[in-house]
Amino acid sequence: MKEVVIYTDGACSKNPGPGGWCAILIYKGIKKVLKGFEENTTNNRMELKAIIEGLKALKEPCKVTVYTDSAYIVNAINQNWIGKWQKNNWKTSEKEEVKNIDLWQELLEFLKVHNVKFEKVKGHSTDTLNNMCDEIARSMIKEMR
């Protein structure tokens, strides 16, 4: 099984507002940058979108390590919030509807195909690829305005 690393980040101006996302895929040292923009969105949607688009770009099942600065996503997966949400008919522990259900469900489909591990990185710190993702995601907002 091929091993791929994906760095991701999402950004949003005004939250909600215009947003951008970036995913950097790395396979055997070769980098591929994916990026996108949405007119009216939230930061969490852009974080999820970056991961989904990164996984969507893979042409076959892979072993993937996703690096993200989103504690929301890492905790939802690694602490199995997502499993609890599904059991509770997509309700949080406070009985509120989970936000971004459409994207969580799409992500779950890719998690069935790929063996994915999520790692939290500190945002706006010393991680070069995370910083690059952040810059690209933010630049998408500026470019598309």
UniProtKB/Swiss-Prot annotation:
Say where the protein is mainly found: cytoplasm
Query: Which positions in this protein are listed as binding Mg(2+) 2?
Result: 9, 134
Enzyme superclass (EC)? hydrolase
Q: How the cofactor binds, per note?
A: Binds 1 Mg(2+) ion per subunit. May bind a second metal ion at a regulatory site, or after substrate binding.
Q: Where in the cell is it found?
A: Cytoplasm
Q: Where are the transmembrane segments?
A: none
Q: Which family does it belong to?
A: Belongs to the RNase H family.
Protein name per Swiss-Prot or TrEMBL: Ribonuclease H
Q: What is the lineage of its organism?
A: Bacteria, Bacillati, Bacillota, Bacillota incertae sedis, Caldicellulosiruptorales
The gene for this chain is rnhA
